[in-house]
Amino acid sequence: MNAWQRGLLLALMGLPAVLAAQPPALPAVKVTHRAPMYLDTARSQLGFEVRSRLGQRIEGNFPQFEGRIEVLSDGRHQVHLKMFTRTVEIPGKVRYTGWMRGPDFFDAERHPVVEFDSLPYDPARVDQGGDIQGRLMLRGVSHPEVLRVDKAECARPGYDCDVVSRGTVLRGRYGMDNWQFALSDRVTFVLRARLTGVPEP
């Protein structure tokens, strides 16, 4: 037996010990991709409230809006909302509607979309109520804001009952600082959300 053959034999004899020392293979990881959930715009409502300096509450709504909820790989959710200002209205008040769409308020001609993108959050917050942090883009200006979600009134919020959330912003921070003598600086957005389809198990 020459030196090369002896070396090969020794290597083969030591192979079982090397294999035994190897850590066991990790089990395959099952990656689940869940489709986004979408707002049912026919059954959802998205509006806003602002008060006059005399205490009168002015209520408006966004007839056109859209929203989706992304399900992240770690189970958290992330919501994306769009509100279209060119159709915003104060029901029954043509003059107020024109003013809300005009340059002193939403400035719909230059800024036709208001957007809110949340940070990832635990979906249990929708059941229990709580704050959802995010960022609002309004009139080309972006600031961190908070949506406050009411505690759910049913076992399947978004399907059997509305998910109700509110977010109050200071309009002066977004360049909507005219009419301060007549209107409060606070504008509250109100979302009553229903989802399309059926809940996944």
Whereabouts are the PLM-identified features?
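Residues at the start of alpha-helices and the adjacent loop-to-helix junctions
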Residues: 8-9, 13, 59
